[in-house]
A protein has these predicted regions:
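Extracytoplasmic metal-acquisition and chelation regions
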Residues: 2-7, 11-18, 25, 29-249
Length: 249
């Protein structure tokens, strides 16, 4: 078991996330012979990906449960304890966990920390006029962008425990194959919606990557952060737009 890796080596994970996935997949994952990797993740999306990638070779704890707003969440003492005990800390990045941004940047100085979403190339990220210098963080809404985060998590786990490499790669390939299958099905179904009705109105403007992936115009009542507010004039204008375009609920 080799977990005395330098922080520099883990950060190199991000540099290699654009490499292609292996095509051949063994019939069964390798059996773990070392202690499972202890992973603490912030969001459910990151935690779910880590569980699928790690399988029996990882123990994953997610700090945020269902319904928790990652934009407003702040770390608790219990969270800090779990993060301190982890072999690998996974957070989303791209300012999704806005209140914890500074904490994680400092925490990464002497620990294995990965901002998984920041593995996505910047030319594939959506900039936002309301937040200068920052990108829309909701990349999990597009499977093709989410792939970069998944591969980054896989590579970080392999760097921490190379002995699990075969199993981690196999689990990752299976996970990505399932995502691709669901995405293909979604494209087929959503293509049946008439073009003029492909308008998605949401309370929180978190679906822009979804819109790009599946050909929908997306309008949010709030901005990309839940901290923004919506005025009555905007809501009235959106109602008029829905009526004009004959968009069904």
């Amino acid at each position: 078991m080799n977990r005395s890796l330098s922080r520099r080596r883990l950060l190199q994970t991000l540099a290699g996330t654009t490499a292609g996935l292996a095509i051949a997949m063994p019939a069964t994952p390798a059996v773990a012979t070392s202690h499972p990797i202890n992973v603490t993740a912030t969001t459910g999306m990151i935690g779910d990906a880590a569980r699928r990638i790690g399988g029996k070779n990882a123990r994953v704890k997610s700090l945020m449960g269902p319904g928790v707003d990652p934009h407003a969440y702040r770390q608790t003492r219990t969270d800090i304890l779990a993060l301190s005990r982890a072999d690998l800390v996974l957070w989303h990045g791209l300012y999704l966990e806005a209140q914890m941004e500074g904490f994680f940047r400092g925490f990464a100085e002497d620990r294995f920390v990965l901002a998984a979403a920041e593995a996505v190339p910047t030319d594939l990220l959506i900039a936002h006029d309301d937040y200068s210098g920052k990108f829309d963080p909701h990349i999990w809404m597009d499977p093709e962008r989410w792939v970069y985060a998944v591969r980054a998590i896989r590579d970080a786990m392999i760097n921490i425990e190379p002995e699990f490499s075969t199993a981690l790669r196999t689990n990752t390939d299976r996970y990505l194959a399932e995502i691709a299958q669901v995405s293909s099905y979604a494209k087929h179904v959503l293509a049946t919606v008439p073009a003029e009705q492909r308008l998605l109105v949401t309370a929180h403007d978190a679906f822009n990557y979804f819109g790009l992936a599946y050909g929908f115009e997306v309008v949010g009542i709030q901005g990309i952060s839940t901290e923004s507010e919506a005025g009555l004039n905007r809501i009235s204008a959106l109602v008029d737009l829905l009526v004009q375009r004959k968009v069904r609920a």
